[in-house]
Amino acid sequence: MFRNNYDGDTVTFSPTGRLFQVEYALEAIKQGSVTVGLRSNTHAVLVALKRNADELSSYQKKIIKCDEHMGLSLAGLAPDARVLSNYLRQQCNYSSLVFNRKLAVERAGHLLCDKAQKNTQSYGGRPYGVGLLIIGYDKSGAHLLEFQPSGNVTELYGTAIGARSQGAKTYLERTLDTFIKIDGNPDELIKAGVEAISQSLRDESLTVDNLSIAIVGKDTPFTIYDGEAVAKYI
């Protein structure tokens, strides 16, 4: 049986129970530049490598703020990430206006997954070709979620997505017992994230132009560092 008999849409299962279009969407994540997320009990951090198409273009935005307590980083198709981040921003505003409370981070992940899952079960759409790392802080503490276009969301202490992300993942696994205990010291958590992302680099080095950092936590609203603000972490 040929694979191309079953990969023309997202609603046809292969004889082995696979949805090939969804698997192809997961592969799109690996085309994006690497981004790292990690958290302790009090803070969560995103560290992302930005790319530019050529020497005459600006660097692509990799980290997006959704609310004062939440934001995300992307790997994959940036237009798809823009749609999802706008949706999440609307849900954050709705929660604040209607219920007078911040949207819980876990709830935000579930809302995104429900939106993504619809594109795996109906004609006329395609799966989102982007992976997201979502960080936030709510009454239950700091959170790090990984969103996949298959409709899965996972809460983690640390992970990396994008091209050559395995090096960063291996570093985080090796230092897990160290960085999860970094409470009340966000600079040390950021440095751990920068060291992790450097493990995924080959022919390039981190600079103030291609590095983007975000942090959120206890008494710390979601803040993005770009340009000279990241120099002290390199």
From Swiss-Prot:
Protein's UniProt keywords contain rRNA-binding: no
Q: Looking at the keywords, is Cytoplasm present? A: yes
The record's listing under Gene3D superfamilies reads: Glutamine Phosphoribosylpyrophosphate, subunit 1, domain 1 (3.60.20.10)
Q: List locations, semicolon-separated.
A: Cytoplasm; Nucleus
One of the Pfam families matching this protein, by short name: Proteasome_A_N
Instruction: Please give the start and end residues of each transmembrane region.
Output: none
Phosphoserine-modified residues are where?
A: S14
Q: Site of the Glycyl lysine isopeptide (Lys-Gly) (interchain with G-Cter in ubiquitin) crosslink?
A: K191
Q: What else is known?
A: Present with 7210 molecules/cell in log phase SD medium.
What is the protein's given name?
A: Proteasome subunit alpha type-6
Q: Which organism is it from?
A: Saccharomyces cerevisiae (strain ATCC 204508 / S288c)
